[in-house]
Amino acid sequence: MSRFGGRLREYPQLSIDRFDYDNLRARAYFLSHCHKDHMKGLRAPALRRRLQSSLKVKLYCSPVTKELLLTNSKYAFWENHIVALEVETPTQISLVDETTGEKEDIEVTLLPAGHCPGSVMFLFQGENGTVLYTGDFRLAKGEAARMELLHSGTSVKDIQSVYLDTTFCDPRFYHIPSREECLSGILELVRSWTTLSRYHVVWLNCKAAYGYEYLFINLSEELGIKVHVNKLDMFKNMPEILYHITTDRYTQIHACRHPKDDDYVRGNRLPCGITCQNGTPLHVISIKPSTMWFGERIKKTNVIVRTGESTYRACFSFHSSYSEIMDFLSYIRPVNVYPNVLPVGGSEDKVMEILQPLCRSYRRNTEPRYKPLGTLKRACKRNLSDTDEDELFDTELSARPKIAKYQGEESKPSQTAQPENAERNINESTESYRANTAYTSLKVDFVDCEESNDDDDDDDDDDKEDDSEKNTAQVLSHEPDANSIASCNGIPSNQQESNADIPSWDMFFKCNKVDESSENEDNFPSSADAGGSQSLFSDSDGVSDSTHISSQNSSQSTHISEQGSQGWDSQMDTVLITSQERNAADFSCFSRGGSRTALLSHDTPRDSQADDSRWKLLGQNPSCASDVICDLKSEDCEKDAEAGTAPTQDLLVEISDSSRTPDLELKRDSQSSSDFEIPLTPDAEIPQRDKLHYLYKKLAAGESIMRKNSPEKR
């Protein structure tokens, strides 16, 4: 049953297969075929008055449809307003508004629909694009490709919209036997029955007044028996059909219809009431052409199915099957498609879900878009109301500069004897070092790759108030000043003014939070009694801004455990520090309950010439900033380090160790071998095994290690 409203979206001034309500004001009417569900309002008084008051409104249809319509006296008033258009012949039509005189020309082409005699499809072409209205149609697969008027040259015309017959647009009706297959099955049944005797009669139980003429003609031609029908009026001008039908009831094939219902003549199954003249009873079988019944079957059936003692069902369809609809639409490939009929038990949403993937508009909207991922450095904050067209990643922002979070306080100039080598300092307390992560831009060999999911950014503020959480890795380009360190260790600032810039332990290592309660401090052994792991790192050029790579990010870091260690009570922690091209190398130590011994060695000029400004970590010994305090003094103070010895660049510094966590001490036991390989410094010599054994043995015993350098290397 058609549910088409009668108006095309592209050409609303036309009315097709619907002639009531707003359609009455249309400038032209079109009728695809003479079935009642497509003729609503066609003989209504309102439309009749509209025709009487208009001189230009016409009804366009095929010649067969015109003959079928005018054979019914109820539509006789249309005789002067019907224009028959030749099938497959493009025709120019002028649409004139009788009120304003506005005129629009469109081209319409009638294409065979294969639904019933006279049924056509309308192809409209005009300023608003090409539109195809199928009405009811039955086209076999590949038949659309054979229609020349659907093509422009060798390609299919650019069709904007298709108003489609979707009666069987349901997977249940995926395949419907073709008319030839149905005809073959019916023909065999009728032949086998009628040849038994002249009293064996077949009744074709057809529900429509017309539409089965294809079946009648072929049965008559094959068997030589005319088909009995109720009326011949509608076919009087169609001799090709009229020759195969008759009103004579004494024939073996009947297609007559009951006036009201199937029980019109009880005891006789023929609606016409024919009986044998000599009293011999007739043997009648009924064949009901149907499609819906076969679609409801679960199992595959034959074209002809026996449903009773003398009743049969024959699969015979006037509408395209599901697969035929898909074939037609995939070949036409319109921009839009609109269903004219809803399948039994279906909905418009389900039908559109099936049809839309075959439309070009759907393909354009769902075509995958390949976009570059962009910079994967951090999550981009976006408004939640952004549409789906937004990119997943921010490709417009440049790399975020690595700057310290707190720069409110200006760094104080270093009050040392060498102001030309002084660096800018960041005045931060130890708690600030624990709670915050400061970022700085690196100038050498820095792999800047942060992958963030907004968790790190959100946790920055929370870390300021929660000392129990782990701190993020710190990469600092500046050194903390002496005043800040002195205040953290309880030493007055006036005692520290003579000290040079002091690098903080947190500048090089990730700090793990330690509970500073007195209870924990009592449980920790002093660093003087405890043995620790060694850490090797190198400083960059003292003239330029220092650049560092944190131990957790550096690929050159490794862990070295002490050889011959005797446990906690045997030795002190030793840290080996290497400085490149630094002019001042003096040390002062501040302890808080314990001490460590640190060895600082100065690289030779040959080593400083290498373009390696990264820190080489030879052991990871995380601690808080308040645990390690170092002062760098002038080079002249080196000479007073040891009496009777040559000037050295390797010194021992005691480093406070008051808050080592048990977890960190337990980890040292497992560091029995190097975890990574340390790349050699350019132009450096590989130390011999016996020298390394001797060096480690002295380090394990807590003894000072001095390296004599030749005068030319100073």
From Swiss-Prot:
It comes from Gallus gallus (Chicken). Keywords: Adaptive immunity, DNA damage, DNA recombination, DNA repair, Endonuclease, Exonuclease, Hydrolase, Immunity, Magnesium, Nuclease, Nucleus, Phosphoprotein. Residues 544-561 have a biased composition (Low complexity). InterPro entries: DRMBL, Metallo-B-lactamas, RibonucZ/Hydroxyglut_hydro. Residues 447-468 have a biased composition (Acidic residues). It is found in: Nucleus. Its main location: nucleus. Residues 427-440, 484-500, 532-543, 562-577 have a biased composition (Polar residues). Gene3D superfamilies: 3.40.50.12650, Ribonuclease Z/Hydroxyacylglutathione hydrolase-like (3.60.15.10). This is Protein artemis. Its EC number is 3.1.-.-. Residues 603-615, 660-670 have a biased composition (Basic and acidic residues). It is an enzyme of class 3 (hydrolase). Residues 391-500, 516-577, 598-617, 638-683 are annotated as: Disordered. Belongs to the DNA repair metallo-beta-lactamase (DRMBL) family. It holds the Pfam family Lactamase_B_2. GO terms for molecular function: 5'-3' DNA exonuclease activity; damaged DNA binding; endonuclease activity. The gene is DCLRE1C. The modification Phosphoserine is found at residue 670. Required for V(D)J recombination, the process by which exons encoding the antigen-binding domains of immunoglobulins and T-cell receptor proteins are assembled from individual V, (D), and J gene segments. V(D)J recombination is initiated by the lymphoid specific RAG endonuclease complex, which generates site specific DNA double strand breaks (DSBs). These DSBs present two types of DNA end structures: hairpin sealed coding ends and phosphorylated blunt signal ends. Interacts with PRKDC.
